[in-house]
């Protein structure tokens, strides 16, 4: 079965694993997903990640982070730009997620970056998702 939106699949797997209180979740790997996992780790939304090689595309193992034993750090993770309706923003149109408490993730000419970095660089891009 072909997957039409692998990024939405990744975000859904992370959301579902967090609600089920899992410590880790395995996701089919790609360069874009690894960049997104790296950004989530740098922003403190996940503990860590690692890429496990197999004979196919590899597996991205994401280790989830919890405030205590039951509360997941990620309250909401939502896909914004979808294959059926891409959402592009310029540097002035980048949204603030929960008045700066959350993070908007953009795909730009400088790679996968946060809304704060995009404002500093003065560039826009495709609004991939929001996390808070």
UniProtKB/Swiss-Prot annotation:
The keyword RNA-binding applies. Gene3D superfamilies: 3.30.1370.30, 3.30.1490.10. The keyword Ribonucleoprotein applies. GO terms for cellular component: ribonucleoprotein complex; ribosome. GO terms for biological process: translation. SUPFAM superfamilies: Ribosomal protein S8. Keywords: Ribonucleoprotein, Ribosomal protein, RNA-binding, rRNA-binding. GO terms for molecular function: rRNA binding; structural constituent of ribosome. PANTHER family: 40S RIBOSOMAL PROTEIN S15A. Belongs to the universal ribosomal protein uS8 family. One of the primary rRNA binding proteins, it binds directly to 16S rRNA central domain where it helps coordinate assembly of the platform of the 30S subunit. Part of the 30S ribosomal subunit. Contacts proteins S5 and S12. This is Small ribosomal subunit protein uS8. The gene is rpsH.
């Amino acid at each position: 079965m072909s997957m039409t939106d692998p990024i939405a699949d990744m975000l859904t797997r992370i959301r579902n694993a967090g609600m089920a209180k899992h410590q880790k979740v395995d996701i089919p790997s790609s360069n874009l997903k690894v960049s997104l996992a790296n950004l989530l780790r740098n922003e403190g939304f996940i503990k860590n990640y690692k890429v496990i090689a197999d004979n196919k595309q590899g597996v991205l193992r994401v280790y989830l982070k919890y405030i205590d034993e039951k509360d997941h750090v990620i309250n909401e993770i939502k896909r914004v730009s979808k294959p059926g309706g891409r959402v592009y923003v310029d540097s002035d149109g980048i949204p603030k997620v929960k008045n700066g408490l959350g993070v908007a993730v953009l795909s730009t000419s400088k790679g996968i970056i946060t809304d704060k970095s995009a404002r500093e660089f003065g560039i826009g891009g495709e609004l991939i998702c929001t996390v808070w």
